[in-house]
Amino acid sequence: MNVAVERLDSEWVDSWCKRVSAALEPLMPSFLETHVFPPGENAVALATDESHGATGALVDLTPIPSDLTTLYWVISEISLPDIENGYFIHSPATVAEHFREYGAAEVDDESPGVVFASDGGGHLFAVATSGRVWRSTTAAWFDDFEGAAVSMQEFLEQISQRIADQS
């Protein structure tokens, strides 16, 4: 099903990064009080010249969805191992490496998706050219994918909500 969605805006992503970083700051010191182990490194890594170069190489390698390009213009990667069972948005260099090794993910009847993220349970997240985000049903690259969010923005908002729920 192709549903037209508004494309991701870099200013919105920048604002989202600031909100997430601010939400993580008070959460991590209290983590040890509610868990039997210390927190991992929960961080939003902003884009650098190096990650911009890796994004350019990824664009040359595959028809990368525009929302993923926008995302990588602002961030390099995100590591949230202590939010639920963990959420990880991979760096553009890692996405390119995985694309070379595994190719595109077949997601429903849409164009193939580019895997850009995973969770701590091994599930993969792929974005199709429509901007829709898909989640693998198992911890396998070539298994079925189901809809996770209608857009990259909704996917990021879901992560924000999970952080808020954990506070």
Language model feature labels by segment:
Residues 127-131:
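Short acidic-glycine loop/turn motifs at beta-strand connectors
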Residues 1-124:
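A surface-exposed partner-binding patch
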Residues 95-97, 122-126, 140-148:
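Short, surface-exposed beta-strand/loop "edge" segments at domain boundaries and coil↔beta transitions
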Residues 113-119, 160-167:
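Short secondary-structure transition/capping segments
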Residues 132-140:
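Intrinsically disordered, low-complexity regulatory segments enriched in Ser/Thr/Pro
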